[in-house]
């Protein structure tokens, strides 16, 4: 029965929680719009190309305007990204060449070069990031701060170097003080970690869940005993070795060649979990293709999957988390502070329904209508909060149906 719940959760998550980008190809104004990133807004490549043109005009009108150049480059970068084009593309090179003429040696130019070089195989992008770290402006934005936080983490220095730790801490604190991430994303991240055992390993996918978790740890001093590990970083030797050292285990010895990056992830994950002997959890954004047979060892404990080589009553743990650890009341409360609902990330709230609907059914089967109805209200509220079309919301409401 527990395995069935797991399979259902994984299947619905794969089909329902990975949103497709909506197309907004029209421009209602000739003024450029702020490029807030794909985790915030859902636009297509054509929209970003149009914004690149508009921001380029603005930058050319005032060639020393770093914000205009940053927005122009960001638009070019996202246009390429949505077409699966990375590295020094013609689109980004055209913008970078202009930036080199007008704002050379600036924070904006150095960070843009870092982002570009980072995506080029065999290129060392770190010199550009190091230059940018020496030029951090007081009004640094969310995307730039997040980029540097990720760089510092990937370097592996955050595990041992005091200066790197301080810089990362200051940048993360700045994200919190500037309300860079909506509170509902932080509340979701908090609930995910509330149900974990102490000193846990938390393997995670996606920018929003990772930054949300790090803000809780660094700015609010919560869940600091847990290691929040972006799975994609495990492919980076410097990060991987530093992580292993911090866990008190020998560095992972990678083979010279792997059939795929997913095979590397599989071996590294198994190695770290088994050698560290710590409880290990995976976010529901975990892509099972990254680790072959991992779904056979993952058990839904509420909002995260726990890794276990042996079967156990995971639904009992999920119910205990719902009753004793998760703070779900906020889903029913009015919004006291008006804050953005990020279209590119709001689907994360659907994981409440996807992951916890099996718990509602478990309550019903046990005849516990009180807990079943209460939890169903919370989950329905999480879906209602999103801006999805009603017909799409209904697909999630149907997860509470007694029909098989």
Model region roles, listed by residue range:
Residues 1-30:
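Bacterial Sec-dependent N-terminal signal peptides
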Residues 13-16, 153, 203, 299:
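Generic detector of intrinsically disordered, low-complexity, polar/charged segments
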Residues 20-198, 218-404:
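ER/secretory pathway lumenal C-terminal domains and tails of membrane proteins involved
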Residues 195, 199, 206-210:
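Local sequence-structure signature of Cys/Sec-based thiol-disulfide redox active-site neighborhoods
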Residues 203-207, 231-232:
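Short His-Asn-centered micro-motif
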Residues 211-215:
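Phosphate- and divalent-cation-binding pockets in alpha/beta enzyme and binding domains
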